[in-house]
């Protein structure tokens, strides 16, 4: 089940404010979706995700199929019961992970033959198998199996002919995914994925074919796969706003805070990316005034929080805690620097909470700006503040 309502639009861009109703709850859009690859957003309790405003999270079809396996998932009634998350979940199709295996896989019209990265077993993923796995996971949004068109093929930029071959296979797999999804009687929502590499004419062909299939929602895939930023932005400016206005639009695997705000301006409703969690574990933190490298020696004695304007547990602490010097109960940059240098577990937990809070709060501010008819002003202010530097 999926219902999508447009609540407001921006007159200076393609941005829109929406409300997405799914089987496990309502999602206010535009939204960022934290990535929970193995059934967990790394280092963060489900309760903390809810507290920071997460409305929908991702699960990884491929990895959950590998471990713990479908028998375990079925015994819990799906992914929600397994990971104790009562809000909506989106699962990818497994196509990107299979594509990432490189020489360990062979793609044919029927599907993908590959060796399990866990134990080396020979396995097969097809559109039908992907739909069966995602039906067992009982995710609210299911993604068609597609072939992620790479930016480079055999050491050269993917040619238009190579991108066409890949896009047309994804289009045929979309038909098979939809047929199997309907045969299984899956009560959730299936999204089609626009492919075509960096070629706008192929993107348009893919888009038109998928729209004819009448999916409940659509995604733009095959971006942020190694291409230069200007080419990614070019596709982002071309494709999303051409998708049906009355259906949700999802930009897969993107990206930086700047990418999210520009994506919203191009008509995107949904985003996911591992960047906030991965960067947190590697010591890069996002703030209102730019990115901060907590490993830099200059933070060794810094008493400031990561971001004085942030209300996450890392920056503001827990309610009711303060210090005699008037400071808040949050953690200093010096303390987070110390945890990182010592390899303490608490370090990446706190930085992950901060980065996710930043992303989710950014989308909340975007929604509020759209509600107020002020998205253009917000967009300009956001750019200026991020460019200022920490």
UniProtKB/Swiss-Prot annotation:
UniProt keyword Cell inner membrane present: no
Binding site for Zn(2+): 310, 312, 315, 354
Enzyme Commission number: 2.4.2.29
Highest taxon of source: Bacteria
Catalysis performed (reactions): 7-aminomethyl-7-carbaguanine + guanosine(34) in tRNA = 7-aminomethyl-7-carbaguanosine(34) in tRNA + guanine
Enzyme superclass (EC): transferase
Active site per database record: 92 (proton acceptor), 272 (nucleophile)
Residues the entry annotates as binding substrate: 92-96, 146, 195, 222
Note on cofactor: Binds 1 zinc ion per subunit.
A biological-process GO annotation: tRNA wobble guanine modification
GO cellular component annotations of the record: cytosol
Pfam family, any one: TGT
InterPro entries: ArchSynthase1/Queuine_TRR, TGT, TGT-like_sf, tRNA_ribo_trans-like
Sorted UniProt keywords: Glycosyltransferase, Metal-binding, Queuosine biosynthesis, Transferase, tRNA processing, Zinc
Stretches for region RNA binding: 253-259, 277-281
Gene Ontology molecular functions: metal ion binding; tRNA-guanosine(34) queuine transglycosylase activity
Subunit description: Homodimer. Within each dimer, one monomer is responsible for RNA recognition and catalysis, while the other monomer binds to the replacement base PreQ1.
Its job: Catalyzes the base-exchange of a guanine (G) residue with the queuine precursor 7-aminomethyl-7-deazaguanine (PreQ1) at position 34 (anticodon wobble position) in tRNAs with GU(N) anticodons (tRNA-Asp, -Asn, -His and -Tyr). Catalysis occurs through a double-displacement mechanism. The nucleophile active site attacks the C1' of nucleotide 34 to detach the guanine base from the RNA, forming a covalent enzyme-RNA intermediate. The proton acceptor active site deprotonates the incoming PreQ1, allowing a nucleophilic attack on the C1' of the ribose to form the product.
Record-stated family: Belongs to the queuine tRNA-ribosyltransferase family.
Protein name: Queuine tRNA-ribosyltransferase
